[in-house]
Amino acid sequence: MSFSLQTSPLDLLDKRLLNDIQWTFPLFERPFLKISLSYGVSESEIIHRISKLKTKGLIRQINAIFDTRKLGYKSALVAFSVKPDKVDFVANEINKHPGVSHNYERSHEFNIWFTLAVGPNDDMKIVLNNMASLDGVIKYRLLPTLKLYKIGVKLDMVNGDPTVPLPSDKVREPVAKSFEITERDKDFIRELQKDLKIVPEPFRIPAENLGITTTELFDRARDYEKIGVMRRFAAILRHREAGFIANGMIVWNVPTDSIDEIGNRLATFPEVSHCYRRPVYKDWRFNLFSMIHARSLESAKKIALEISKIIGIDDYQILFSTREFKKERVKYFEKV
């Protein structure tokens, strides 16, 4: 199974560039010069192309992607059931929290779905209860990750297929090492999570803000990646602008004794970008969640049906996003 990109004016170099920088953006003094050497073009050509791709909206931002849990944050998926005439109001209020990264309206009784991350000293239930007190909220369900089977997919802009992503530089597992965050670490994280400027020496800006050299900045970033605190430093693409316009969350009701088997099988499908086990409630029976991105609703439905037949689970629903209220990286260690 595969799904392809919409017709796009991008040339082959643009597509190859997007393929590379969404997973292996170089941590070097002049990163665009280093990229240019791989393609036999000038540094200014790469800067121009990446600037153009950002302007077009294909690249959302370029920054460090951190592991929420390694930073001491608690995160969860949350489903709100909201009166239809209050959806916009509630969604806008939810968006004000810096720990809300993704927020969508979906076609279901639970019509607002968002991810929430709270800091080490914050209580998620207090934050959620405050949100749930908003006018129009009927009820909500907290759906934290009980087990992770897959996270992340690299969109193949050349061939139109999703592929399994690789860590920066080479395949490796994070080194097992305890990480106790310091105030200085927080300073680094605040800088590394910012969108990188598209200029010849972009890393000079965060380095100067931290009062250090770029070499020291790179050493710290690579150390974070080595121990798994930073997943990667990369360009983040917008799925819709890249041609994957159908955002479908497939939820499955899987027998408890086979959930690990099914979760691991789901993780092998290239169309599945994320796969998690989550809790169930009396009014929510689905315990396995998977995300797919396709070029149309019909294509997504066909993908789901084919996966269903292969894994032998027919009790599932696809919750399509009808509106995107917010999609951005969590702003770590920023005050509400």
Model-derived features: positions:
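A compositional/biophysical signature of low hydrophobicity enriched in polar/charged and small residues
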Residues: M1-V336
